[in-house]
């Protein structure tokens, strides 16, 4: 992450529940920095992947899951701390949508390498529940994002009739300081509110949007990527299978160029380039499923993100914050304290291998989508990060697979 060398600053951020007058900046990068082309994902370039994706090949294939962004892009040239250039944002993921904010989901958390932050996970580990949205931003905006989530939930959640309601939000980060004025604290509470308020199902953007705006992956322009897999589980040949979906969303900000492998092809070695002198970066991953799983089983799903990342070449370096959380939208209302007991459904451990496989496959594809559905970007001090060239990737994949 290269973030531990900065001096620590203490901020007191005061805000009410209403939005301030500043409108979130939702502009795309200047036209000169991007090509005006249609959305292109990895499969559009002929990249082969294992498994059967959901309809949208997205985390939003899991019914109820909603994703929202605030993208902050402004300024050019030399860094002026507090003014810019700004290349950052906020991502919000709501497990069962806006209509179920008061219904926690079973969840599990895993840290592959802990040079990072995902708040609230001590309580996820202890309770087995995720109680609200997941927000992802840059390293130095975790505090303001966490406070904003609490304020937003006070406004939009169930009335607090006791006066003792509390919240431990899940807010995660990766470092975008190569392109962004990260010490300028440009993410404000209203930016978090906007991402939460505008979260939706269906098709979502990838690449340099939301929290992924200023991120770098394998020394190409990185950011957000998503993918999904349909999973058929059956107990015997004589019973019809039940179909579930696993979806992965990640904020990709990791890896050296030479490590990059796509569909088994060492792409990074054939497209040389360098942004950093040493391994630097992180990955935040969110796994969603409608399969009925218990918290310990969801932790096992979260662990499998590691294998999907490894298929793209990363070794999860010392400076990497690789933090993963998984949740299930099944078993609604099981956290309701109005009943002494609840009846729940769960899949036996012996039948979980297809789910593990789906997470690995979707994670691998989500990383490549983050690289492909993207554009080159210039940020602070004219730092430039190129996007993965589509024509070259297509050529390398086609040549490699024609030789097999």
Residue ranges and their predicted role:
Residues 22-404:
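Alpha/propeptide regions of enzymes that mature by internal proteolysis
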